[in-house]
Amino acid sequence: MFFVMDPVFLSEITVELVKHSASDSDVVFSARVSTLGSFVAVTDCLSNRDIGLITFLMRERHGSPFEHSHMTFRISAPIFVFREFMRHRIASYNEESGRYKNLDPVFYIPDEKRKLVQIGAPGAYKFEEGTSEQYGLLIEEMKELSLAAYDTYKRLLACGIAREVARMILPLNLYSTMYVTINARSLMNFLSVRTSRANSAFHSYPQREIELCADRIEEIWKGLMPETHAAFEKQGRVAP
């Protein structure tokens, strides 16, 4: 087995827009076909009436017109983030395979902004800052165990053990990469539960790492569909 990369520890999650067919006008012409049939004029120039229609659809939760806008993202994040992401069975996923390639030694470690201490019972808890001693211990242990696991992974592969078996030794903070294709309606559902906002009609308490991922996705989507995003915000971030 051939390994060319030294171990790397990161505290970042990266999101890149690969391609899209997503605009506010997609919502408008998809909705208006209901009443105008084949006479719908497709244009990227929105009138005030068009913007009002988007707001109406969002408020009244007429969701299907929002399904005609699609985005594909390339995301690099630790495996535990992807396991939460894929609970949303409303997107298409293809992930880097540990069966078919050697996995790179890139590991996630929390930065110092990460709150470490859980206070309260499940369903009614909050997180507070940890001490410098707690943070130091966490990082020391994570790095030590990550390196030990990866060394074992390499030894298993060198002994002829299959990738799909050897990978079982690797920890959840290992980075992976996946492509996600999702429509705007499904994306709003994802954002409604994976972000925490003061104006949300239904408050959510996402894990910090998946919220970082969601924040980056939302910023990209907002640039593609600003009027749809504004309507989403106005209606308390409830998916239609």
Curated annotation (Swiss-Prot):
* Keyword annotations from UniProtKB, A to Z: FAD, Flavoprotein, Methyltransferase, NADP, Nucleotide biosynthesis, Transferase
Reaction equation(s) it catalyzes: dUMP + (6R)-5,10-methylene-5,6,7,8-tetrahydrofolate + NADPH + H(+) = dTMP + (6S)-5,6,7,8-tetrahydrofolate + NADP(+)
Top EC class of this enzyme: transferase
Q: What residues does FAD bind to?
A: S64, R87, H88, R89, E95, N183, A184, R185, N189
Instruction: Name the CDD domains on file.
Output: ThyX
> What does the record give as its pathway?
Pyrimidine metabolism; dTTP biosynthesis
Q: Where along the chain is dUMP bound?
A: E84, F85, M86, R87, E95, E96, S97, G98, R99, R167, R194
Names of required cofactors: FAD
Q: Where is the signal peptide?
A: none
Q: Which InterPro entries match?
A: Thymidylate_synthase_ThyX, Thymidylate_synthase_ThyX_sf
Q: Where along the chain is the active site annotated? A: R194 (involved in ionization of n3 of dump, leading to its activation)
Gene3D superfamilies documented for this protein:
3.30.1360.170
Origin: domain of life = Bacteria
Could you tell me the Gene Ontology terms of the biological process aspect for this record?
dTMP biosynthetic process; dTTP biosynthetic process; methylation
Enzyme Commission numbers on file: 2.1.1.148
Q: Which residues form the ThyX domain?
A: 13-235
Cofactor: binding comment = Binds 4 FAD per tetramer. Each FAD binding site is formed by three monomers.
SUPFAM superfamilies named in the record: Thymidylate synthase-complementing protein Thy1
Q: Name one GO molecular function term.
A: flavin adenine dinucleotide binding
State the span of motif (ThyX motif): 87-97
- Explain the purpose of this protein: Catalyzes the reductive methylation of 2'-deoxyuridine-5'-monophosphate (dUMP) to 2'-deoxythymidine-5'-monophosphate (dTMP) while utilizing 5,10-methylenetetrahydrofolate (mTHF) as the methyl donor, and NADPH and FADH(2) as the reductant.
Summary of subunit composition and partner proteins: Homotetramer.
Sequence similarity: Belongs to the thymidylate synthase ThyX family.
Protein's recorded name: Flavin-dependent thymidylate synthase
Organism (species): Tropheryma whipplei (strain TW08/27)
